[in-house]
């Protein structure tokens, strides 16, 4: 709970977007929620307990994200406590494959869905239904569009939009040198200054095309409990294994072009990454209340 409006969960705040759209356009927009194997049951029970936030139950569908095996530093696949292959979620880029495996794309087509907004649950200011976003995409005649923010400063740790081999892409902050970070164009703006905030919209045609083309995998060094060859359960104190995941922005490289809509940070970005500190429940609550209490 964020402790706002009062004590609304992030899911309820997002659902409010959809209920507002119902008021404005007299239609219940389908809501597809990707969960993980670990939290799927708990998430569904949470919705049931809260009466689906008074949104039609048949308009909300859950589907489970895919997983990939984890490997140790020796390259061998790890086993979990039950002695079976240890797996981890395959990243938010796995949404395309998961949508096909769980018949989500088919359901969308049967419901006449043409545009799909894909956004995070951990941002209470995310706009689930943005008329301007879809309007720009249609006007520019592209199959995808993403939202961006101007970087807070050259060294802000965010991925940024760019062109790679003539196609849209996002370059991660770890790949941006100090020189690149400070580089400016003739108007004095940062060359690498359009932050990707993981709020994207895809045409169903793009979803189908991307879903039939594998995205690259990235490795992340993580700490994971596992069973060793003797059958002992090992709980490491430091990272000991690699998980593999794909990122949603890697899908941009599958497209010839896409549009970017720059938005205001104060109006659309209040990420929740922890309980306290930067990008926390505390800061998100403050940003959310500040936005909704504007005169």
Predicted regions span which residues?
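Short, internal active-site loops enriched in acidic
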Residues: 36-40, 123, 266
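A general secondary-structure junction signal
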Residues: 35, 64-66, 262-264
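Conserved beta-loop-beta/alpha segment of the NTase-like Rossmann-fold superfamily
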Residues: 52, 57-156
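N-terminal glycine-rich phosphate-binding loop and ensuing alpha1 helix
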Residues: 1-58, 69, 80-98, 105-106, ...
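Residue-level signal for inorganic ion chemistry
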Residues: 43, 122, 203
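Short hydrophobic/aromatic-rich motifs at helix boundaries and adjacent loops
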Residues: 14, 76, 178-179
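A structural signal for isolated positions on well-ordered beta-strands in alpha/beta enzyme cores
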Residues: 30-32, 61, 145, 259
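Catalytic core of tubulin tyrosine ligase-like
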Residues: 108, 112-117, 125-129, 134-294
């Amino acid at each position: 709970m964020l402790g706002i409006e009062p004590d609304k969960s992030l899911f309820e705040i997002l659902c409010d977007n959809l209920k507002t759209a119902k008021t404005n356009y007299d239609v219940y927009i389908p809501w597809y929620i990707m969960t993980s194997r670990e939290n799927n049951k708990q998430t569904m029970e949470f919705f049931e307990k809260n009466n689906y936030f008074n949104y039609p139950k048949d308009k909300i569908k859950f589907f489970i994200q895919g997983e990939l095996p984890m490997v140790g530093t020796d390259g061998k696949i790890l086993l979990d406590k039950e002695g079976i292959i240890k797996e981890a979620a395959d990243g938010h880029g796995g949404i395309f494959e998961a949508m096909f495996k769980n018949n989500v794309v088919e359901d969308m087509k049967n419901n006449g869905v043409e545009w799909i907004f894909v956004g995070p649950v951990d941002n209470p200011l995310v706009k689930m239904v943005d008329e301007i976003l879809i309007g720009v995409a249609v006007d520019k005649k592209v199959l995808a569009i993403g939202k961006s923010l101007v970087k807070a400063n050259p060294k802000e740790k965010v991925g940024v939009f760019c062109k790679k081999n003539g196609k849209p892409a996002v370059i991660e902050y770890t790949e941006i040198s100090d020189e690149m970070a400070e580089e400016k164009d003739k108007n004095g703006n940062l060359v690498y200054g359009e932050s990707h905030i993981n709020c994207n919209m895809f045409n169903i045609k793009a979803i189908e095309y991307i879903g039939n083309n594998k995205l690259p995998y990235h490795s992340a060094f993580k700490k994971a409990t596992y069973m060793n060859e003797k059958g002992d359960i090992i709980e490491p104190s430091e990272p000991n294994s690699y998980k593999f995941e794909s990122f949603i922005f890697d899908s941009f490289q599958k497209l010839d072009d896409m549009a970017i809509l720059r938005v205001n940070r104060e109006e659309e970005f209040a990420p929740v990454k922890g309980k306290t500190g930067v990008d926390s429940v505390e800061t998100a609550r403050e940003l959310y209340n500040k936005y909704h209490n504007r005169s």
